[in-house]
Amino acid sequence: MSAEENKASVRRFFEEVCNGRNLRAAEAIFDPELVYHEPLSVSPGGKGITAIQNEVSIYHKGFPDAQWSVHEVLAAENDKVVARWTGQGTHRGELPGIPPTGQKVTVEALTLFTCKNGKIIEMVDLWDALSMMQQLGIVPPPGHASS
């Protein structure tokens, strides 16, 4: 597939699965052998389309108003695509082990995608989990003692 087609697959993920809340659309975007890496994953090293569906679903439930804003989608060498994005939402639902706080959260991220035959086969999320935990009040910001 061309670099533009790979970038289109990545954009579809953010538009249809994340912002469109259509988890079934993942079946057309991701390879069944998907390998998913994410720092706070409930299933580290998740495999298969259900891994990404489960992860996105957790954020939809925890942040019902969540929106993913994609700032850049860049094609790298061969089958690689990088997306720079921001996630925003209000923590109104439970995250695993974290009851709702009502806090508004903004998180910056980069995701590295690997595409094969027009589908995403690997996804590595690198996002500021510490900042999210600070915004939720779970971890104190630098210079503030925990209570």
Which ranges hold each PLM region?
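C-terminal and inter-domain tail/linker signature
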Residues: 1-147
